[in-house]
Amino acid sequence: MNALIDNPEALASGYLAMAQVFSYPDAGAWSRLTERGLVDPALTHETLEAEYLAAFEMGGGKATVSLYEGQNRPDLGRDGILQELLRFYEFFDAQLSEDDREYPDHLVTELEFLAWLCLQEHAAVRDGRDAEPFRRAARDFLDRHLAAWLPEFRRRLEATDSAYAQYGPALGELVEAHRSRLGEQAPQLGELQ
């Protein structure tokens, strides 16, 4: 993970990989995940899809793990979270996909936005422009959103016997590496909650 710390482009790749992992695993997604080594090819598409549904949609007799920030932070009210996220996206003119139709507080949407901020930072540095606005935005977004609900999400995910449980620590490490790079003074993810 150390190679990620000083490289916003690598951080973006990490966020996009995690976004792929936590996206619905249709046949095409499963192929991409296995080709990139993100999922063991021994785990068939059908099995991965069943694992996804059991973990995030139906529970399979257990409580599901929500992929939505607003459902992981009910004390704040989902409407307020959605409005704040939309303001973040709108400020940077980031458009939500018309095809996916995911809510702004979906884990994948938040991961993709952080990847976009990292890529904007990388482009600014490459082009000799000020990258600090993108760093500040990423720091603020992490503090207000992903890092704020990730501990509870991870706790619940890692308590499942799902194939997805293995990705909780990797996602946590990615976020911590990014926060460390940004000089974050907030508590570590394990200290939150």
UniProtKB/Swiss-Prot annotation:
InterPro entries named in the record: DMSO/NO3_reduct_chaperone, DMSO_Rdtase_II_chaperone, TorD-like_sf, TorD/DmsD_chaperones
Species annotation: Thauera selenatis
Organism placement in taxonomy: Bacteria, Pseudomonadati, Pseudomonadota, Betaproteobacteria, Rhodocyclales
UniProt KW keywords: Chaperone, Cytoplasm
Name of the featured protein: Selenate reductase assembly chaperone protein
Entries under Gene3D superfamilies matching the protein: TorD-like (1.10.3480.10)
NCBIfam families: DMSO_red_II_cha (TIGR03482)
GO cellular component: cytoplasm
The keyword DNA-binding appears for this protein: no
Disulfide bonds: none
Recorded coiled-coil stretches: none
Function description: May function as a system-specific chaperone protein essential for the assembly of an active selenate reductase SerABC.
